[in-house]
């Protein structure tokens, strides 16, 4: 079995600043419609946006750090306290399949000031 690991951490204030400065333009550039909807229904959407941002960055680091991918093609789904699942589209999915990966695990955490994520890609 071969695995590839990516991780990321972001200061929640950084995402809050981007959201205040660029608003919908920032959201629509990074997050899918379903991700935006999920986060907007939270008391404070910023930690949830930050965590999803980290997942996208961690996926890119795990699959190919030098490649440019549309972050909206990397979607995080799952219950609030349940198992998370990545759903890939377009070039992200194509790259995942081309490299022969057949599985992915995601871990995401939030704290008051930071959000972090780890993505593990694997092929058997």
Swiss-Prot record:
Homology family: Belongs to the P-Pant transferase superfamily. AcpS family.
EC number(s) from the headed UniProt entry: 2.7.8.7
Role, per record: Transfers the 4'-phosphopantetheine moiety from coenzyme A to a Ser of acyl-carrier-protein.
Residues given in the record as Mg(2+) binding sites: 8, 57
Single GO term (MF): holo-[acyl-carrier-protein] synthase activity
Superkingdom of source: Bacteria
Cross-referenced HAMAP family: AcpS
Annotated catalysed reactions: apo-[ACP] + CoA = holo-[ACP] + adenosine 3',5'-bisphosphate + H(+)
The species this protein was found in: Leptospira borgpetersenii serovar Hardjo-bovis (strain JB197)
GO BP terms, alphabetized: fatty acid biosynthetic process
Keyword tRNA processing part of the UniProt annotation: no
Co-factor requirement: Mg(2+)
Protein name per Swiss-Prot or TrEMBL: Holo-[acyl-carrier-protein] synthase
A GO-annotated cellular component: cytoplasm
Name of the top EC class for this enzyme: transferase
InterPro entries: 4-PPantetheinyl_Trfase_dom, 4-PPantetheinyl_Trfase_dom_sf, ACPS, Ppantetheine-prot_Trfase_dom
Keywords: Cytoplasm, Fatty acid biosynthesis, Fatty acid metabolism, Lipid biosynthesis, Lipid metabolism, Magnesium, Metal-binding, Transferase
Signal peptide: none
Location relative to the cell: Cytoplasm
SUPFAM superfamilies: 4'-phosphopantetheinyl transferase (SSF56214)
């Amino acid at each position: 079995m071969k695995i590839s690991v990516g991780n990321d951490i972001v200061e929640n204030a950084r995402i809050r600043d981007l959201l205040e400065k660029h608003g919908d333009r920032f959201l629509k550039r990074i997050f899918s419609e379903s991700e935006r909807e999920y986060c907007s229904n939270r008391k404070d959407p910023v930690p949830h946006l930050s965590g999803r941002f980290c997942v996208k960055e961690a996926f890119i680091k795990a699959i190919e750090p030098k490649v440019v991918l549309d972050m909206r093609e990397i979607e995080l789904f799952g219950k609030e306290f349940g198992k998370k699942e990545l759903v890939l589209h377009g070039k992200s999915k194509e790259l995942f399949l081309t490299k022969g990966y057949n599985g992915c695990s995601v871990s995401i955490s939030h704290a008051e000031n930071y959000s972090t994520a780890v993505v593990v890609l694997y092929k058997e």
